[in-house]
Design a protein with these regions (language model features):
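Sec-dependent signal peptide recognition
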Residues: 1-5
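N-terminal signal peptide c-region/cleavage motif recognized by signal peptidases
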Residues: 7-9
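Extracellular/lumen-exposed scaffold segments
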Residues: 11-197
Length: 197
């Protein structure tokens, strides 16, 4: 039997900070707001204690990416902030330390109560896979900081254009070669390989 600690227990387009009794190292919060164009913006905030991490959509050799099982099927565009690389005991993973926010866009008919279960993997010396059931009352506002926080989260996403002056890739005899040039030079460059969706 799992015992859940809900902070706070309120119905709003803001879940408040949720913690699970079996994982005191992470807190999660979901907020959502439907826009005039019909799209719904959702922000998943994750706060991790020092020394703990969670994972990117392509977590690397270990770890599990966060996922949401929606109670109502939805079309979701989940956006991922630029990750960090973690090398521990010869295993390389990609993800996040500290606080991270994942901005998402939901399309389609949003029910008055948006609910589901977030599954989040967090790791330090041990790994914990935790489920966070949530329910958002979409008839109420997400709060006055939502637009600011969503815009700020969008600013943490990888740049699509303008970072390189030249980018080429070739695959010959089982070897992938990626060449990236930047006129301004590089400071601590990193390449993150993402699996195909």
């Amino acid at each position: 039997c799992l015992l859940w600690l809900w902070l706070p227990v309120s119905q709003a387009a803001d879940s408040g900070w949720l913690r699970a009794a079996d994982n005191q190292h992470a807190s999660v919060r979901l907020r959502a707001q439907t826009e005039s164009n019909g799209d719904t913006r959702l922000l998943l905030d994750v706060a991790l204690e020092k020394g703990w991490k969670t994972y990117w959509r392509s977590p690397g050799e270990g770890g599990i990416a966060p996922a949401i099982a929606w109670h109502t099927p939805l079309e979701v565009n989940w956006r991922w902030p630029t990750p960090q690389r973690f090398d521990v005991a010869g295993i390389s993973t990609q993800g996040y330390h500290g606080d991270v926010s994942f901005p998402m866009t939901l399309r389609g008919k949003i029910p008055p109560t948006l609910s589901g279960v977030l599954t989040l993997s967090t790791c330090s010396n041990v790994c914990i896979l935790t489920d966070y059931p949530f329910s958002l009352d979409m008839t109420t506002p997400a709060g006055e900081r939502f637009n600011y926080d969503f815009t700020r989260a969008m600013g943490t996403l990888p740049l699509r254009d303008g970072l390189t002056s030249q980018l080429t890739a070739s695959y010959v005899s089982g070897k992938l070669t990626v060449t990236a040039r930047r006129d301004a030079g590089w400071q601590q460059p990193a390449l993150f390989i993402d699996s195909m969706e």
